[in-house]
C-alpha cells in the first residue's frame, strides 16, 4: 500500500468499469464491478443460483462471519470479514457482504402476493403487473425506481391487462 492506496487492473466492461481482485485464503481471482454508490463491498457467494463466478467463504481460512442487516434489502446473504488481494497486496479483515443472490423485485417491495414480474423469451421485453388484492383498501405498494440500460434503443411502455 503506497501513498496513493492500492493499485489493481481496471478495464471497461459493457457500461461499467471492472477491476481484478482476489478474495480469501487461498486467494480466488474475480473481476468486480466498481460501484461508487456504496461503501460496502458485495460479492455473490455460494449457494447463489446466478451464473456468475462465486466466492466460497466456507472454503477460506480467513473468512469470519458478522451479523448484519442491509437497508434496502436488495440482496440476501451474510456479512463477514475476509482477506482481499489487489495486485500483489493482500489486506486482511476487509468487511464485505456475501450475497446469495439478488432478491426478486416482488420480495424487495414486500408485495410478492400483489405483483408479478414475467421475463419472456424475448430478452428485449418484460411484463410488470400489479394485481388487486381481495381487499384493495389495505394495499400499500412502496415507491420504487427501475433503471433500464437501453444503449441507443427506445423504451416504450404499454398498458395492458395482467396475464394478457
UniProtKB/Swiss-Prot annotation:
Similarity remark: Belongs to the peptidase A1 family.
EC number from the UniProt entry: 3.4.23.12
Glycan-carrying positions: 93
Activity as a function of temperature: Optimum temperature is 55 degrees Celsius. Thermostable up to 50 degrees Celsius. Retains 60% of the original activity after incubation for 30 days at 50 degrees Celsius.
Subcellular location: Secreted
Domain of life (superkingdom): Eukaryota
GO molecular function: aspartic-type endopeptidase activity
Principal subcellular localisation of the protein: secreted
Tissue: Parenchymal cells surrounding the secretory glands.
Variation of activity with pH: Optimum pH is 2.6. Retains 95% and 79% of the original activity after incubation for 30 days at pH 3.0 and pH 10.0 respectively.
Enzyme class (EC, first level): hydrolase
Catalytic activity entry: Similar to pepsin, but also cleaves on either side of Asp and at Lys-|-Arg
Role summary: Extracellular proteinase found in the pitcher fluid of carnivorous plants. Digest prey for nitrogen uptake.
UniProt KW Glycoprotein keyword: yes
Documented activity regulation: Inhibited by pepstatin and by diazoacetyl-D,L-norleucine methyl ester (DAN) in the presence of Cu(2+) ions.
Pfam families to which the protein is assigned, alphabetical: TAXi_N
Name the UniProt record assigns to this protein: Aspartic proteinase nepenthesin-1
